[in-house]
Curated annotation (Swiss-Prot):
KW Ribosomal protein (keyword) present: yes
Family classification: Belongs to the universal ribosomal protein uS15 family.
Keyword RNA-binding tagged: yes
Coiled-coil parts of chain: none
Short name of any one Pfam family annotated for the protein: Ribosomal_S15
Function text: One of the primary rRNA binding proteins, it binds directly to 16S rRNA where it helps nucleate assembly of the platform of the 30S subunit by binding and bridging several RNA helices of the 16S rRNA.
Signal peptide limits: none
Quaternary data: Part of the 30S ribosomal subunit. Forms a bridge to the 50S subunit in the 70S ribosome, contacting the 23S rRNA.
GO cellular component: cytosolic small ribosomal subunit
Name of the featured protein: Small ribosomal subunit protein uS15
Listed GO MF terms: rRNA binding; structural constituent of ribosome
HAMAP family documented for this protein: Ribosomal_uS15_B
Length: 87
């Protein structure tokens, strides 16, 4: 993910100007990285080091989603629908 793509994702999911830390932004950025790494692993099946990183990112995203679910279920449902994630 390059700098421009990252800024686009932040701008799309930010709750206010300069927002980079809200759960929605973090989840969207992790989803982009997870999708990119998943494509990489389809080609490089024996890259176990990257696979571990992928599993850690998925766990981190799951934790953020659980937090958002507990705090504000409407925001949770919106980000799930927008990113096309399944629960």
């Amino acid at each position: 993910m390059d700098k421009i793509r990252k800024q686009e994702i932040i701008a799309k999911h930010a709750r206010h100007e300069g927002d980079t830390g809200s759960p929605e932004v973090q989840i969207a950025l992790l989803t982009e990285r997870i999708n990119s790494l998943t494509d990489h692993l389809r080609t490089h099946k024996k890259d176990h080091h990257s696979r571990r990183g992928l599993l850690m990112m998925v766990g981190q995203r799951r934790g953020l989603l659980n937090y958002l679910y507990e705090q504000d279920i409407e925001r949770y449902r919106a980000i799930i629908k927008e990113l096309g994630l399944r629960r």
